[in-house]
Structure formats: C-alpha cells, structure tokens
C-alpha cells in the first residue's frame, strides 16, 4: 500500500491546487484554492474559456471598470471551483479577497457574493468553504457566516490564539500552516529541523490536541507543507491539504505510515472565550505568527493584483 493510500485511511486527503489534471490524478476528497493558486491555474491553456466567461459576466453586470474587475475576479475563482467540483466528491475552498482581511463587514458581504455565484450555478452551500484569513476581524466575520449556513475555512493560521478564537467562534474548519512556520524558524535560528522537531508540526499537533481536549468540532486541516516528513508526522489529523508534488511523492512511497495524531483523553470543560484584548495579547507574544500572518496577507494581495492586471487587459 502506498503512503497516500495509508494516509487516506486515517485522514481526509485534500488537494492544494487549482490544477484540474492534478486533481483527477490523485482523487482527493476536497480541494483548496487561494489567490496564488488561481493565478497560476489561470495561466494554463485549459482555463482560457473560464477567463473569457468571467470577463463576459463582468461586462454584462457593469460598465464601471473597477466593478468589472471585482466581478471578473470573483467569477473566475468560482468558475475554477465549479470545474474542480465536477471531480471532487466533497468541498472546494474559495478565498475572500485578502485585502478585506481587516474588514469584518466587507468580508461577510464578499463571502455572501461568492456563495451566491455558486448557488446560482446549482451548487449547494454544503460543497463550499469560504476561505478567510485568521485575523480577529476575519474570525468575527466567520462567526456571522457560520450562523447563516456558510461554512468557513480560516487560513493563514500560525498561533494558538488564532486557533482558539476560531474554535470559540464555531468555525467549520481551520488551516494551520506547517511549512511557513518551519521557514520562519529556519531563517531565525539558522538551523535544520527533523520532522518530529519541526516547529510547524509541533504547532499543528498542539492545536489538534487542544481541540480534541475541549471537544471542539472545528476541523483541523494541516496546510503548507515543505516535505513529506511534515505530513507523516501529523498523519491522523482530521484533514491535510497537500500540493500535487507531495501527493506524487506519497503515492510513490510504500514506506510504513504510523498514525501520529489521535486524542484518547477525557473532554474537559472549556475556558471562557478569548476577548479581543486577550486575543491580541496572546497572538502578539509570538513574533513568528505576527510576521507570517501579515506576510501571507500581503503575498495574497500581490497575487490578486497580478490577477487583476491579467483580467484588466481583457476587459
């Protein structure tokens, strides 16, 4: 049995890509996209018609160029999501514009718009996750959306404070990042880490155990992997979203795979929810989390702007 098949027996495997061919090849349960993945997918020739459709949709809706860009961008992300939903049996994660990461109201409105585009295409809410950065404002937006039946995937999650606040808000799923945490520590400490000592692996392990310990239903989906060792060290996590090159490596390996994450203890009484002040105090104790959250939002914003430049040339 391949490591990928062994992993499927203990963890829901998700593909972290917008590439249809890769998704067909590895047959994941779900798929996740983000602005960077949408940007790289939009360069593939098979997506030309999806871009043309998004542009036509935007032109029909408005004469205002700025509004056309926003509409085309949303429609392209949904068009790619619709193609992926033809292949995966589960859910697609589609991300809210990262530039709205500190605006609760605008995030809620954008999430509703994305969901409406899916609904108009005949897709029900239970096949979509709306991806939102795990800022305090994003978490508050998700709390509102979850009550409306719009499930959310809180991403760019680097600190225990972010994870705790998401669970307390009743968020459907979180994506704690592994590889980007490793990147920070390698740069800061100037050293290499074995998978078991990997700070990203330790972070996800702690979050997983915290959620199970307090009986939170929020799904933990490890994300952002730099190597297969990081994946095998958190085998047993609720879900793992994995890029195609690492899915390939897992599929080609027959090395034994041992379940690493499994909580068997008692469920404890939950603490009182974090206040905004407590959230910021705890999150800001972690320089890695501060830097990586801000950097992640900036990087996604840059890729959204590149995507807009590509779309603007067609509008």
Curated annotation (Swiss-Prot):
Main localization of the protein described in the UniProt heading: cytoplasm
The name this protein goes by in its record: Transaldolase
Active site positions, chain numbering: 131
Pfam families found in the cross-reference section: TAL_FSA (PF00923)
Localization, UniProt: Cytoplasm
Organismal lineage: Bacteria, Pseudomonadati, Pseudomonadota, Gammaproteobacteria, Pasteurellales
Pathway given in the UniProt record: Carbohydrate degradation; pentose phosphate pathway; D-glyceraldehyde 3-phosphate and beta-D-fructose 6-phosphate from D-ribose 5-phosphate and D-xylulose 5-phosphate (non-oxidative stage): step 2/3
Gene3D superfamilies: Aldolase class I
Keywords recorded for this protein, A-Z: Cytoplasm, Pentose shunt, Schiff base, Transferase
Enzyme Commission no: 2.2.1.2
InterPro entries cross-referenced by the UniProt entry: Aldolase_TIM (IPR013785), TAL/FSA (IPR001585), Transaldolase_1 (IPR004730), Transaldolase_AS (IPR018225)
Annotated GO MF terms: transaldolase activity
Family per similarity comment: Belongs to the transaldolase family. Type 1 subfamily.
Gene Ontology biological-process annotations: carbohydrate metabolic process; pentose-phosphate shunt
PANTHER family: TRANSALDOLASE
Reaction it catalyzes: D-sedoheptulose 7-phosphate + D-glyceraldehyde 3-phosphate = D-erythrose 4-phosphate + beta-D-fructose 6-phosphate
Subunit structure of this chain's protein: Homodimer.
Function: Transaldolase is important for the balance of metabolites in the pentose-phosphate pathway.
GO cellular component, one term: cytosol
């Amino acid at each position: 049995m391949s490591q990928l098949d062994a992993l499927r027996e203990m963890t829901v495997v998700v593909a972290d890509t917008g590439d249809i061919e890769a998704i067909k090849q590895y047959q994941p349960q779900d798929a996740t996209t983000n602005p960077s993945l949408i940007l790289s997918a939009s360069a593939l020739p098979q997506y030309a018609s999806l871009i043309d459709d998004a542009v036509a949709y935007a032109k029909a809706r408005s004469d205002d160029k700025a509004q056309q860009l926003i509409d085309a961008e949303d429609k392209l992300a949904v068009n790619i999501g619709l193609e992926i939903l033809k292949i995966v049996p589960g859910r697609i994660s589609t991300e809210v514009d990262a530039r709205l990461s500190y605006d609760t109201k605008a995030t809620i409105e954008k999430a509703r718009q994305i969901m409406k585009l899916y609904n108009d295409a005949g897709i029900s809410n239970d096949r979509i996750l709306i991806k939102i950065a795990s800022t305090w404002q994003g978490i508050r937006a998700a709390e509102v959306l979850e009550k409306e039946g719009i499930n959310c995937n809180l991403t760019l999650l680097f600190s225990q404070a972010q994870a705790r606040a998401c669970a307390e808000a009743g968020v459907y799923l979180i994506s704690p990042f592994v590889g980007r945490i490793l990147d920070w520590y390698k740069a800061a400490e100037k050293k290499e880490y074995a998978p078991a000592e990997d700070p990203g692996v330790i972070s996800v392990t702690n979050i997983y155990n915290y959620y199970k310990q307090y009986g939170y239903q929020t799904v933990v989906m490890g994300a952002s992997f730099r190597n297969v060792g990081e994946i095998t060290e958190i085998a047993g996590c609720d879900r793992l979203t994995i890029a195609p090159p690492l899915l390939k490596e897992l599929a080609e390996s027959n090395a034994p795979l041992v379940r690493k994450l499994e909580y068997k203890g008692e469920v404890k009484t939950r603490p009182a929810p974090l206040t905004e002040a407590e959230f910021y105090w705890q999150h800001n104790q972690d320089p890695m989390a501060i830097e990586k959250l801000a950097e992640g939002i900036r990087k996604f914003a840059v890729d959204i702007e590149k995507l807009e430049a590509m779309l603007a040339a067609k509008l």
